[in-house]
Swiss-Prot record:
<keyword id="KW-0963">Cytoplasm</keyword>
<dbReference type="InterPro" id="IPR009053">
    <property type="entry name" value="Prefoldin"/>
</dbReference>
<comment type="similarity">
    <text>Belongs to the prefoldin subunit beta family.</text>
</comment>
<dbReference type="GO" id="GO:0005737">
    <property type="term" value="C:cytoplasm"/>
</dbReference>
<dbReference type="GO" id="GO:0016272">
    <property type="term" value="C:prefoldin complex"/>
</dbReference>
<protein>
    <recommendedName>
        <fullName>Prefoldin subunit beta</fullName>
    </recommendedName>
</protein>
<dbReference type="InterPro" id="IPR002777">
    <property type="entry name" value="PFD_beta-like"/>
</dbReference>
<dbReference type="Pfam" id="PF01920">
    <property type="entry name" value="Prefoldin_2"/>
</dbReference>
<dbReference type="GO" id="GO:0044183">
    <property type="term" value="F:protein folding chaperone"/>
</dbReference>
<comment type="subunit">
    <text>Heterohexamer of two alpha and four beta subunits.</text>
</comment>
<keyword id="KW-0143">Chaperone</keyword>
<dbReference type="GO" id="GO:0051082">
    <property type="term" value="F:unfolded protein binding"/>
</dbReference>
<comment type="function">
    <text>Molecular chaperone capable of stabilizing a range of proteins. Seems to fulfill an ATP-independent, HSP70-like function in archaeal de novo protein folding.</text>
</comment>
<dbReference type="InterPro" id="IPR012713">
    <property type="entry name" value="PfdB"/>
</dbReference>
Length: 117
């Protein structure tokens, strides 16, 4: 890195930072997607039950009885919240990818040898 100009070194540092941010966003996205899939599956199963079915849910370390109606409402809200979060993470991932692409182009241009005109 001795031959690399300081401004390019700074850009490389920024690029590394963006890549780390991207990794974190991707990990968060995977977690939210898994939670969303799980919530949708639970919603499907509860919708199959009769209205008077006995349903239990976990609350912290407890398991408590609930109604089908309450369980459906809570799961629908959870799915909606997770979908909003997933959309936000998708936008964030896209913005970071754009920054990475832009910065990579700047770095490549800065390292390109000047052409004799």
């Amino acid at each position: 890195m001795q031959n690399i100009p300081p401004q390019v070194q700074a850009m490389l540092g920024q690029l590394e930072s963006y890549q780390q941010q991207l990794q974190l966003v991707i990990q968060q996205k995977q977690k939210v997607q898994a939670d969303l899939n799980e919530a949708k599956k639970a919603l499907e199963e509860i919708e199959k039950l009769t209205d008077d079915a006995v349903i239990y849910k976990t609350v912290g370390t407890l398991i408590v009885k609930t109604t089908k109606e309450k369980a459906l409402q809570e799961l629908k809200e959870k799915v909606e919240t997770l979908e909003v979060r997933l959309n936000a993470l998708n936008r964030q991932e896209q913005k970071i990818n754009e920054k990475i692409k832009e910065l990579t182009q700047k770095i490549q241009a800065a390292l390109r040898p000047p052409t004799a005109g």
